[in-house]
Amino acid sequence: MNIVILAAGLGKRMRSALPKVLHPLAGKPLLAHVIETARSLSPTRLVVVVGHGGDRVRDMVGAPDVTFATQDQQLGTGHAVMQALDQLDDTVPTLVLYGDVPLTRAETLNALVGAAGQDHLGVLTVHLDDPTGYGRIVRDATGRITRIVEQKDANETQLAIHEVNTGILVCPTARLKTWLATLRNDNAQGEYYLTDVIERAASEGLPITSAHPLAEWETLGVNSKVQLAELERIHQRNLAQQLLEDGVTLIDPARIDIRGRLTCGRDVVIDIDCIFEGNVTLGDGVRIGAHAVIRDAAIQAGAEILPFCHIEQATVGAQSRIGPYARLRPGTELAEDVHIGNFVEVKNSQIAAHSKANHLAYVGDATVGSRVNIGAGTITCNYDGANKFRTIIEDDAFIGSDTQLVAPVRVGRGATLGAGTTLTKDAPEGQLTVSRARQTTVNGWQRPVKQKKDA
């Protein structure tokens, strides 16, 4: 099967320099959703027709299994498909999709393709309470589809029809090429309508079949920021519904955003206003506190993420406790039962089991052993203005509060660093290392007294 995706529209109502099909829905471009669905149908050829912002669209797709055709002038959907004809295989049917209709399910498209087979024309239609703006499906007395009439070209009788065209169709490729060559633009829009091939098929006696989506939202397109926002909410509601059906506890299903792929184990609990981006995995029994932002991360079984944490490209070990207000940056790997507390930032570091940094610390470019305690205010000074260096803290070390470790430096096994230490040389294992000014008490010292000004 050939698949052609139309993605050349100007998108004037979006009021944006970004091509319409590149606007994000659930964290990825509208067109990316359509291409993902198209790939699931295993097409032999996949062609995207581009126009406005075509170079940016090509750059976004950047995949060897997708080829492109260009529609320099926006002269209608029929004209757009014409631009792709020389890339299509005549021996298999062609399915036409739209880059701004992102949520059509593969199951629905398979039903349409199955109904049409190799020799029939198939149209995806839907019944709408308010069909305003859509092309109407015209059937004869026997129920056969005879034509599709666009809103601006419809008479009063046709405007009363509630079955509408979604624009998605499949038909034999050789016939499609013949019909497109006969299209005319003598209509209110002055465009070449792809839907006119329906009338051509009917006049030749070719059977026209139809299929219907399970839900209206599968056929909704995006022409404005308002419609994009509405479709985002619909999509997020559907994703939340699936999580609930899979056994995830959502404290408020209307207050979660998934902008990628979220995989959850058993007995996962997610509080309000959490955002998941990229590929996120939550193990069994994980609890996510309110207002967390988690991107491309794995949270292992039994871990708890307290409110207002930001986690990106990190791994959180089983039974660990993170936050509140903690930040795990790319390259962070935490083993089991690690505690990262409030206002602690960890970057490109590995922290072994049972270690803790509970308050106000920065751990960057570090390797931390097991059972290490990192005191409040501790900083690994990893950057000299030109290069970054690593800090190594071995098992059972105790780092006192307000300590600076100037990398590259090593803290030996079981070593203790006194509070306020600035460590510039390795600290030997099992020893107390302190680097700070000696405390002095000045006997008889008095605070200065403010002098009185003369009147």
Curated annotation (Swiss-Prot):
One of its GO terms (biological process) is cell morphogenesis. Pathway: Nucleotide-sugar biosynthesis; UDP-N-acetyl-alpha-D-glucosamine biosynthesis; N-acetyl-alpha-D-glucosamine 1-phosphate from alpha-D-glucosamine 6-phosphate (route II): step 2/2; Nucleotide-sugar biosynthesis; UDP-N-acetyl-alpha-D-glucosamine biosynthesis; UDP-N-acetyl-alpha-D-glucosamine from N-acetyl-alpha-D-glucosamine 1-phosphate: step 1/1; Bacterial outer membrane biogenesis; LPS lipid A biosynthesis. Acetyl-CoA binds at A376, N382, Y383, S401, A419, R436. Pfam families: Hexapep, NTP_transf_3. In the N-terminal section; belongs to the N-acetylglucosamine-1-phosphate uridyltransferase family. Homotrimer. This is Bifunctional protein GlmU. The gene is glmU.
